[in-house]
């Protein structure tokens, strides 16, 4: 019999990076989106904040035992980078006058300067989850919050100790 002609085609691309680290990072944690939905302008203008949104960074297949044998503490902290709003918020893109406040697992505000590390989290063998909380607030410009869409991007780096 004759071979059937193709009726559509496509492509699958596989990417990854091998790192010298005691843990891998879950693919969903490496690139995630947090949806705040609709946030009240009046609430933000009066100094309030949105409902907190929790997000996690999941580390996978950690081999902490061998890492500690090399004289390491077996802990991790993170640095975040992005467009700063004041000293401890992430400026949003758009004209809403909003910023994102992120708190680390210890309840401390994350700095988006790419250098100041979050609090340290101890690691165990296997999978580890680091919990964060994000809130929308009025930014530090002094202007009132305006209606419209907002977004912000922060990049993070893991620092193993």
From Swiss-Prot:
It is found in: Secreted; Fimbrium. GO terms for biological process: cell adhesion involved in single-species biofilm formation. The keyword Magnesium does not apply. One of its GO terms (cellular component) is extracellular region. InterPro entries: Adhesion_dom_fimbrial, Adhesion_dom_fimbrial_sf, Adhesion_dom_sf, Bact_Fimbrial_Adh_Pro. The keyword DNA damage does not apply. Belongs to the fimbrial protein family. Fimbriae (also called pili), polar filaments radiating from the surface of the bacterium to a length of 0.5-1.5 micrometers and numbering 100-300 per cell, enable bacteria to colonize the epithelium of specific host organs. This is PRS fimbrial major pilin protein. It comes from Escherichia coli. The lineage of its organism: Bacteria, Pseudomonadati, Pseudomonadota, Gammaproteobacteria, Enterobacterales.
């Amino acid at each position: 019999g004759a071979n059937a002609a193709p009726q559509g085609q496509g492509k699958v691309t596989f990417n990854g990076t091998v790192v010298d680290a005691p843990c891998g990072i879950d693919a969903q944690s490496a690139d995630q989106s947090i949806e705040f939905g609709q946030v009240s302008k009046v609430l933000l203008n009066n100094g309030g904040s949105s409902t907190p949104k929790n997000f996690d960074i999941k580390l996978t297949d950690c081999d902490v035992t061998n890492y500690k044998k090399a004289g390491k503490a077996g802990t991790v902290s993170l640095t975040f980078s992005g467009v700063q709003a004041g000293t401890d918020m992430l400026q949003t893109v758009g004209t809403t006058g909003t910023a994102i406040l992120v708190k680390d697992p210890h309840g401390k505000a994350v700095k988006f300067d790419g250098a100041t590390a979050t609090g340290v989290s101890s690691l165990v063998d296997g999978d580890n989850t680091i919990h964060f909380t994000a809130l929308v607030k009025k930014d530090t410009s002094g202007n009132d919050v305006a209606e419209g869409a907002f977004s912000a991007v922060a990049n993070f780096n893991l620092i193993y100790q």
